[in-house]
Amino acid sequence: MSEANLTECELAYQLTYHPFYMIAQFWSFFVSLLAMPSLIFFMVEKVFKLPFHGNLKFLLVSYFIGTFLFASIICFTFGYHFFVPFFVTSNCDLIINATLFKYGHMIALIFMTIPMILPTAFTVERFVALKMAHSYEHVRTLLGPVLVLVVIAIDSMFLYDIYGQEKFDKPFINFILVPATSALQFNSFLWYMLYLKITNFICNLILLFIHKILHQSSRYRRKNVSLSVKYEMQEISQSSRFTLIVTFTHLLFFGWYVSTILLIRTVGPDFFRGFINYTVMRGVYCATPTYNLVIVFIGFKALNHLNFKRNNKVQSTIQIKSTGQEGAENYDNAISNYWDSVYTMNKSKL
């Protein structure tokens, strides 16, 4: 029987039991299963304890909670792909129930796309923090929650525009395969997301460059600049470097996924010598689930490194020299301050 004449049940059978497809489904399930406790541990040990401003901390907590929820839904959907074939009694049982597909597909997309857009909110918040460096430590946590709501609203609008008229009335074999009627719009959406992430990454680099210029300028090196402002500038630098690392890592994995899936759809079935192989390649979804686990290790390493540099910077900032001409001046100033305080205390007692 030619592939063009395959029924949906026969197609589901040949796709589901394809060795490469099964290995890919198991990999996505396995890394998602590992990612869930790893993300919880990372959030408890690191993210919830970050010394960053409340606005950025709220954004980062939201980002990693979204990543955890995405790993959870991927663990369920790909676990379904891998384990259900061992228990079915007919080929048609491999077809996913339309209602189950609708909710599984949409929930997976929501928690996949929100973390895609959230790094843009990191950049907006960081630019605001840099602009208000002299007073940002006193700003209450409001911008972060507002940006999260804006991101959710924008993401919901995009997805509604893509799936608003989708009936989900076709047989479905895989939770991540976009219905044919919505595929073109979804492809355009992925391109927009890729452009957005590249632009956001460039903005992060510009932010750090501006910060470096300001930090080296005489305005922030004067002695009359308060220690709190210097600390705030240092905090902006450290937190911006961390968000840059998160943004770049997400861009790397997401860019690989988007480039691969769009290339597969562009070359079509003929390149893969048949519709079955073509569908197998479309159903392979490893890059983004792998990111959910890898970001934990990168996050731990990045924060430990930044904290080490931060502690060294703080120690070098508050250290008082005790040798040479500067050490002698510091000693004289300390003695003078001590006797001035003693004189003031004795005078007040008289």
Swiss-Prot record:
**Membrane is among the record's keywords:** yes
Q: What happens when the gene is disrupted?
A: Abnormal distribution of male-derived sperm in the hermaphrodite uterus following mating, with sperm accumulating at the spermathecal-uterine valve 1 hour following mating.
**Membrane-side (Cytoplasmic) residue stretches:** 43-57, 125-141, 211-243, 304-350
- Which membrane topology term applies here? Multi-pass membrane protein
Q: Which tissues carry this protein?
A: Expressed throughout the head.
User: Which segments cross the bilayer?
Assistant: 22-42, 58-78, 104-124, 142-162, 190-210, 244-264, 283-303
Asked if the record carries the keyword Glycoprotein, the reply is yes
Keyword list (alphabetical) reads: Cell membrane, Cell projection, G-protein coupled receptor, Glycoprotein, Membrane, Receptor, Transducer, Transmembrane, Transmembrane helix
Topological region Extracellular: 1-21, 79-103, 163-189, 265-282
Q: Which domain of life is it from?
A: Eukaryota
Q: Where in the cell is it found?
A: Cell membrane; Perikaryon; Cell projection, Dendrite
Q: Could you provide one GO biological process annotation from this protein's UniProt record?
A: sensory perception of chemical stimulus
Q: So which residues have sugars stuck on them?
A: N5, N97, N277
Question: What is a single molecular function from GO for this protein?
Answer: G protein-coupled receptor activity
Q: What does this protein do?
A: G-protein coupled receptor. Plays a role in the navigational capacity of sperm and promotes the targeting of sperm derived from males to the fertilization site in the uterus of hermaphrodites.
Q: Which family does it belong to?
A: Belongs to the nematode receptor-like protein srb family.
Q: What is this protein called?
A: Serpentine receptor class beta-12
Question: What organism is the protein native to?
Answer: Caenorhabditis elegans
Its ancestry begins with: Eukaryota, Metazoa, Ecdysozoa, Nematoda, Chromadorea
